[in-house]
UniProtKB/Swiss-Prot annotation:
Organism of derivation: Kosmotoga olearia (strain ATCC BAA-1733 / DSM 21960 / TBF 19.5.1)
PROSITE patterns linked to this entry: G_ENGA (PS51712)
Superkingdom field: Bacteria
A Pfam family reported for this protein in Swiss-Prot or TrEMBL: MMR_HSR1
Ligand binding (GTP 1): 8-15, 55-59, 118-121
Gene designation: der
Record protein name field: GTPase Der
Length: 442
């Protein structure tokens, strides 16, 4: 697929343009320079054409810290992968020395470049005051737009598609195939190693990795093919405790999208720092996954730093503190060393199979009948609880419908017993919750 990179100095509106092109608030937008710390990949669909667009983290003129230095380093490396570069400048303020330096870098890359003047709401003022100096960059006629207001975006899209097709790229697409992918969200506390794990799986340094908590603030999606199956991995921002996230804080948007990532995933990989153990926040995150009925795999990352006794202690801790997802496979990994990744992928495909598993109705009813005979429901007062019929009515997660005389007579511990007997006698349903819906028999 053709790849279009959005490049430019900080705060010229690259993320706003990205969001306008792909639709939705995918990259975080704020007024402070450098607020987009990750590459964010999206796909543009327009008039039966499609291409990939990448919101880069910005070419920093003089890196102020390790994060900015690495962003510049990786962004420069990414230029070689792009088929077309959108060089975004500020159409209100005109060119700066940083713009000139970036222009020189882009010329040296020998890539196709479209010059985009953003924030142009007043075309007459732009034409008189800014346009003449833009021609001096040597990238041809600039395209004035306002990403915030959607002005001239159609003209830009036409130019992008024409340029790519003239270069020999085939942009026709079949959108119905897009939803076939297994979707996997990588979640967990900040600095647990989610980005390193993500990179080990996809085999690309696309998600910025440092030792500073919270460097992954945008969702970064990567689709790879494993044994012929397309799998989309969602690398999310570390989930903060609610008390630490202010409504106006830019981290707020990341937390909200982390929850969104769980919502749109089929399976979640919960990454826990093995050197720190299971925290209350890990329990809360696991609870979010369980309540939303998503498949789950628990990963103790950084386990290369542990001995066998410590690993056994973590397993005991898992049984105590994450008992409500005791069906989750547990994998010990070291993303930086690369071990445990094959086992993780094996578990991923196992869970992918289980979330779609269906129990034959006859087998299910036979098991429920035997269970109610050996462990009859208590009921309340003088009223007995009765189960007349059972059937699995859905998958992702497996949903069992029980036709009963009165739903109020069935306690959660009793339903938990039904789930357990299904796992023990029919299938373990590794990595997936089993939901039970009670319906009164008419």
């Amino acid at each position: 697929m053709a790849t279009v990179l959005i490049v430019g100095r900080p705060n010229v509106g690259k993320s706003t343009l990205f969001n306008r092109l792909v639709g939705g608030r995918r990259a975080i937008i704020d007024d402070q320079p450098g607020v987009t710390r990750d590459f964010v990949f999206g796909r543009v669909f327009w008039q039966h054409k499609s291409f990939e667009v990448v919101d880069t983290c910005g070419l920093f003129d003089s890196p102020k810290d390790i994060i900015e230095e690495k962003m510049k380093e990786v962004t420069l490396a990414l230029l070689s992968e792009g088929d077309l570069l959108l060089f975004v400048v500020d159409g209100r303020k005109g060119l700066t020395s940083a713009d000139m330096d970036i222009a020189e870098t882009l010329r040296k890359s020998k890539k196709r470049v479209i010059l985009v003047a953003n924030k142009v709401e007043n075309v007459d003022k732009f034409t008189l005051e800014v346009l003449p100096e833009l021609y001096s960059l040597g990238f041809g006629e600039p395209i004035p737009i306002s990403a915030e207001h959607g002005l001239n975006i159609d003209v830009l899209l036409e130019k992008i598609i024409k340029t790519l097709e003239e270069a020999g790229h085939l942009l026709d697409y079949e959108p119905e195939k897009e939803e076939d992918n297994l979707k996997v969200a990588i979640i967990g506390k900040p600095n647990a190693g989610k980005s390193s794990l993500f990179n080990s799986i996809v085999g690309s340094d696309r998600s910025l990795v440092t030792e500073i908590p919270g460097t992954t603030r945008d969702m970064v999606d990567e689709t790879i093919e494993i044994d012929g199956m397309p799998v989309t991995f969602i690398d999310t921002a570390g989930m903060r405790r609610k008390s630490k996230v202010g409504v106006k804080n830019v981290e707020y948007y990341s937390v909200m999208r982390a929850v969104d990532a769980i919502e749109r995933s089929d399976i979640c990989i919960l990454v826990i720092d093995a050197t720190l153990g299971i925290s209350n926040q890990d329990q809360r995150i696991a609870g979010l996954v369980e309540k939303r009925g998503k498949g789950i795999i628990t990963v103790f990352n950084k386990s290369d730093l542990l001995n066998e006794k410590h690993k056994e202690s973590l397993l005991s801790s898992f049984e105590r503190e994450l008992y409500f997802i005791d069906y989750s496979p547990v994998v010990f990994t070291s993303a930086t060393e690369g071990f445990g990744i094959d086992e993780l992928l094996d578990k991923l495909f196992l869970v992918a199979e289980k979330i779609d598993l269906r129990i034959p109705t006859g087998l299910l009813n036979n098991l429920i009948s035997r269970y109610t005979l050996s462990t009859p429901p208590v009921g309340r007062k003088n009223k007995k609880a009765k189960i007349y019929y059972a059937a699995q009515i859905d998958t992702r997660p497996p949903l069992i419908m029980l036709k009963v005389n009165d739903p109020a007579l069935f306690t959660e511990p009793y339903l938990r017993g039904i789930r357990s007997t299904i796992r023990m006698n029919i299938d373990p349903f590794e990595g997936t919750p089993i939901f039970i819906k009670l319906r009164r028999k008419k």
